[in-house]
Amino acid sequence: MSAPNRSPIPLVMRAGSKPTSFPVAETARAATYLIRLRHFVVPMSIGVYAHEEDRHQRVRISVEMEVELPAGGIGDEIGRVPSYEGLVEGLQALAEKEHVRLIETVAEHVLDLAMAHPMVLRAVAEVEKLDVFPDAESIGVRFERRRED
């Protein structure tokens, strides 16, 4: 396989500096679109403290998936796109599982669900506990994963 054609792209320069550039690969990239599930709130058994094991807490989950547009387009066919319903059902099942200690663990599981469809190239998961600190709307994490080429 031959190396991709590379052309230099000039960078912004500071006053008095010499121009610099670096090669940028010129490769064809598939057309993509985004699927977003925003602010899905579910009760979960989550937390590291003993008092958190006896009750459920509200957790807000948001997911963004960058999806490869199929060759020839979608054609208004549900079989040519990832299932939104499958994602929501997977999140509900995740919320009903046994106690989880960390929101980071939940975010990893959310990414596993999102990346399960082969058309998904990249996924972002945001997981927030809503009722932890009285002076904050939430505390949370944001994880991102890309499919390896």
Which ranges hold each PLM region?
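N-terminal, polar/charged subdomain of small-to-medium soluble alpha/beta proteins
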Residues: 2-149
